[in-house]
């Protein structure tokens, strides 16, 4: 009997990448594998994506792990380098870098490098998190063009703040701003991440940057914009096993704090997974779990190693039966909505105690 196991379906990953190529047929694809491949395993994911043209990471350590693992395709450091001491490592390992600040520009201008850095200039088009402001752009571009440490031509990118909100007018404003600012630029451009690829086709430029959708999880909350609706398949299925099936009488409480009281005589299943495995302790009563092909509600507080579900009075489930926490048959987005979080958080927060099995 297995405890918490995350099954990673690499065929689904390949399928999803091909669907994204169909969605944006004129764009090259930078597969975002930051945060340990969104919790799916950095190297395993990268090596399962022969159709990706490049990879995106957040930390230089992630890029070096890919290089040490034999990945030779371009790797982009999406947050850029953190200090001047990173620059020799970046150019030695052929890691492309975002530049989003004057401090980074000054570090490039003063560095003594053996090779040039490939730079993606990030423009703040309205999210106001990272990026040079539009009024700074001309000066920054001129200085980067004049810098011997920077490979030419420059590349350009920005990031959406509200692309998952189809009612927002911010995304169209960002698209128009970016297209206007980069008009006439010789370098390649990238604007669309997952939501942009799926809902804002005008943002599909020379490069797209799929993240969460690549793993078969939708960035949207609307049912008609589920991953399945986009013909995407879940890559991760998180499972565990029933380790006990108990008779609980009407009026009896279950678990820490007694936050669930049975309204009838029923059977409660105990599943070997908890917040020690990364399953959120904040999951409330009623959070769905899939047991033997049917949805059953969580009943009681998630503990470190276990959680409990109401199997129903006529349940035939037995010890050893599999429970699916999310994945095939139970989308992570649905679970996240019940918990009050986002699916990104679910898949990236599993702990080392969860066995990763690649299919």
Curated annotation (Swiss-Prot):
This is Alanine racemase. Pfam families: Ala_racemase_C (PF00842), Ala_racemase_N (PF01168). The active site is at residues 34, 256. One of its GO terms (cellular component) is cytosol. GO terms for biological process: D-alanine biosynthetic process. Keywords: Isomerase, Pyridoxal phosphate. Catalyzes the interconversion of L-alanine and D-alanine. May also act on other amino acids. Its cofactor is pyridoxal 5'-phosphate. The modification N6-(pyridoxal phosphate)lysine is found at residue 34.
